[in-house]
Amino acid sequence: RIENGHSSADFEVVMGQLPNAIIPFARIADINIFVRTDNIDDLDWSDLIQTALFDSGRSTLLVSSVVPASIAKRIVIAWNGSAEAARAVAMTMPLLQQAEAVFIITVDDEGDDHNPSKLAATLEMNGVTATPVSTNADQASVSSALIAKAVKVHADMIVIGAYSHNRLGEMIFGGVTRDLQSRSDIPILMVH
């Protein structure tokens, strides 16, 4: 919560069987924040994040254990034209409106349904100046290409519509969301 320029937060110690024990808390939070660490014993980290995303109806912010110098000043929107990506843009509009720079990144753009220029025009109507950027994955994964481009534009946050492919397919084959969770040092704001 932000009041008079000061922010506040509450922290809860959750008792019970993870990941389901977090659901009642996650549903009433403004945002769910997870700090990624390499030292998690006996807990499937991606299950915890998936539960927060699928079962809370709230945004989830994943940050690495390295504290960033800034956050939400230079935002990358990972745009694939999906309903989840559109929802992510809508839910983060206040952040986008206050950012110093916004970039819409598409990877291997193949169609008009996820044309970054059309999204930029829509954002402009909401007071957000966004720069469309296309890139190719080539031999790298989509998440690697996305991270590389985000680093190049000095992004301090990536906004993504999480799990835009079905949950089972993402669990079996991986996917951009899951790959970003494990590889990005840039904070990721995920919306499903």
What are these regions (language model features)?
Residues N20-T106, R183-H192:
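Intrinsically disordered or low-complexity boundary/linker segments at protein termini
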Residues P24, T51, P94, K118-A121, ...:
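Alpha-helical scaffolding segments of alpha/beta enzyme cores, especially the outer helices
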Residues I2-N32, G127-I158, A162-M171, R178, ...:
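Structural beta-alpha unit
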Residues G81-V133, A137:
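Redox- and metal-dependent alpha/beta enzyme cores, enriched for Fe-S-associated oxidoreductases
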Residues I40-D41, D109-D113, A137-A140, N166-R167:
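Short, small-residue-enriched loops and turns at beta-alpha junctions
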Residues S46-I49, S117, L146-I147, I172-T177:
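Charged helix-capping and loop-helix junction motifs
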Residues A9, V13-Q17, G57, L61-A69, ...:
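A short, terminal or domain-edge coil/loop segment
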